């Protein structure tokens, strides 16, 4: 079997491999950047609500031509960018289970969710 036959029988597959949670911690950021540099991942999603985001974003800038970079929308378990004090006395976004129950009961605070999403997007854009 020659190369022409192989390529016709098994055309190359374009695959995107995304490393999630960039920015959640410096260690995760180091690992994802290493994978991007090695060509092992082709994309990453960034947690702009993380307290490490701004610093980690600066480290990612030189790699922007090597991978697709997107926003990881964070709605659970992290410190919010919007004021959730009326819905979360702990100072954190609700747990996944709590958010799920809020959705089932029709109790999602839509205005607050919109504000959180807007702030996360603004933080993401501001870093680049």
Language-model features and meaning:
Residues 14-16, 41-45, 66-72:
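Structural preference for beta-strand elements that scaffold enzyme active sites
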Residues 20-22, 47-49, 72-76:
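Active-site beta-loop-alpha junctions enriched in small/polar residues
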Residues 3-26, 32:
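Boundary/entry segment of secreted carbohydrate-active catalytic domains
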Residues 7, 32-38, 54-68, 85-94, ...:
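Acidic (Asp/Glu)-rich catalytic clusters
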Residues 62-80:
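Short, structured active-site "lid" loops
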Residues 112-128:
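CE4/NodB-like, metal-dependent polysaccharide N-deacetylase domain
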Residues 26-51:
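A short alpha/beta connector and helix-capping loop motif
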Residues 79-109:
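Active-site gating loops and adjacent loop-to-helix segments of metal-dependent hydrolytic enzymes
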């Amino acid at each position: 079997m020659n190369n022409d036959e192989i390529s016709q029988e098994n055309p190359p597959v374009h695959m995107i491999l995304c490393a999630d949670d960039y920015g959640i911690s410096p260690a995760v950021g180091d690992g994802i950047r290493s994978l991007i540099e090695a060509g092992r991942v082709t994309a990453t999603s960034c947690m702009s609500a993380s307290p490490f985001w701004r610093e980690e974003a600066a480290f990612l800038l030189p790699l922007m031509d090597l991978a697709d970079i997107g926003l990881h929308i964070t709605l659970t378990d992290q410190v919010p960018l919007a004021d959730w004090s009326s819905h979360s006395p702990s100072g954190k976004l609700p747990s996944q289970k709590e958010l799920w129950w809020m959705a089932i009961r029709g109790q999602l605070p839509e205005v607050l969710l919109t504000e959180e999403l807007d702030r996360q997007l603004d933080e993401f854009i501001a870093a680049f």
